[in-house]
UniProtKB/Swiss-Prot annotation:
Gene3D superfamilies: Alkaline Phosphatase, subunit A. Optimum pH is 7.1. HAMAP family: ApgM_A (MF_01402_A). Its cofactor is Mn(2+). Belongs to the BPG-independent phosphoglycerate mutase family. A-PGAM subfamily. This is 2,3-bisphosphoglycerate-independent phosphoglycerate mutase 1. Monomer. It is an enzyme of class 5 (isomerase). The gene is apgM1. Pfam families: Metalloenzyme, PhosphMutase. The keyword Translocase does not apply. It comes from Archaeoglobus fulgidus (strain ATCC 49558 / DSM 4304 / JCM 9628 / NBRC 100126 / VC-16).
Amino acid sequence: MPVLLIVVDGLSDRPIDGKTPLSVARKPNLDRLAEMGINGIMDTIAPGIRPGSDTSHLALLGYDPYKYYSGRGPIEAAGVGIEIKPGDVAFRANFATVEGEGSIFDKTVVDRRAGRIEDTSELIKALREIELPVELLVERGTGHRAAVVFRGEGLSDRVSDTDPKAVGKKVKRCVPLADDAKAKKTAEIVNEFMQKAHEVLENHPLNRERAEKGLLKANALLLRGAGEMPHVPSFKDKTGLRLCVIAATALIKGVGRVVGADVITPEGATGNKNTNLEAKVKAAINALESYDVVLLHIKATDELGHDGDFEGKKAFIEKLDEKIAPLLDLDFSKTCLILTADHSTPIKVKDHTADPVPVVIVHEDVRRDEVSSFSEFEAYKGGLCRIRGMDLLNIALDLLNIAKKFGA
């Protein structure tokens, strides 16, 4: 009896004039799921703590992020297929656009996503040719994202980001966060890479072509989330259950690989608003035949929240609603379906917030409540009340009568 966990990234919002994209979207299928299940709100980490997508997904799978999270870099790197070794220092990277004179650290960020560039494969090839005192690994992620790994003796993840995390600010120098030789050495290597990467990208033919077309150059990399790979017990060892993750986004694929899940990326799944939702839903339904837990990740709502695009987010929710229709035909005497988000990405904030997210659990044995609409304004009225992300899977396993008893 499997669990289907659907995580719609950044789905929920703070109201604008009393409305959110989710509350005003036409979504009969999402509303039907709310009507069929037990509803509530959820703090994926804890009240008032703004979750990352990585930490929240760890929590949703039952892993304490305060114990197992060591930075976004190694998870992102795992997601793009880099095998992280002991001592490696991994970063998450964005291709970005910078302007100004002088070194990379004198230049100002004008777009942290380089106009949402889609294909960076040629740029990645050029970056791999950079020579450093240590081995360099660079892999393409989804869209403007990438992963950068430094491999060598005497490195440390106790170093700062180079991403200022805002436009209009200068690129940051990497500085050691510990008073030791390893951190100082690593910071120096990161700064050397930053400058050399900028020189390679600024003069790359692809960027000259982009400039001629009036597009933003992807002429810098912004690094953040330095980390070394932690020891994480596999989901199978931890729970005795087989896990499958269906995702296109490198970070979520990385979470899956870190916990030992099988990861599936259906054809046409992109992690943006043009993703092949039909293929992802079909893959999830098929996976329920072979796995105990299937995590289906949907990314575009988060991207549209970061862009501050109310109408775009609303439209994508309506598209998602249409494409999940086949899930209503599942046998809920044998399957537990959970629909939720990993965090809020409000239109007015354009970033993650700690606002609790709506959640509904559908199974024939749930104590159905009177909620009939899936939204931020209705979910809190439901019978689940307010839960934590780490509670979610336990609740589902209890409904399926495969939870272990605590005590005599």
